[in-house]
Amino acid sequence: MAKTERRKKPRTLPAQIERAISAAEDKKALELVVLDLRKAAGFTDFFLICSGTNPRQIRAIADSVMDALAAQGAKPAHVEGYDRSEWILLDYFDFIVHIFAPETRLFYGLERLWGSAERIELAH
């Protein structure tokens, strides 16, 4: 019997999101996932969600994402949570980056709340 091969659908994400993903990965962000909200919400197209292990790493991930996108001329319209560093939100209109402490991510459960959105796993 022939073995059935599973193929992942190739991901096609906007270049700015790919850049944000790379910047987050450069700072060792954990559990990266993208939610495609185009069919589920009117206020943004995508969420990029990831975690850091401590406040310093969470800020470093946020700084890396902001620096990488600023190099391309993009600045967040809004930044929240930078000082506390339990949940930093970077709003780029078309997509929003959420950087969580693990326990905060579990508590708020964005992936669960937006369960109807297509989930794009980022295995690199």
Which residues are covered by each model-predicted region?
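A short alpha-helix capping/helix-coil boundary motif
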Residues: 1, 43-46
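Long, contiguous binding/interaction regions
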Residues: 1-34, 38-39, 53-60, 67, ...
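Glycine/charge-rich, flexible interdomain linkers and switch-proximal surface loops
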Residues: 31-43, 77-94
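Short glycine-rich or small-residue beta-strand-to-loop segments that form or flank ligand, phosphate
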Residues: 47-51
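Compact, glycine-rich, soluble single-domain proteins
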Residues: 57-74, 89
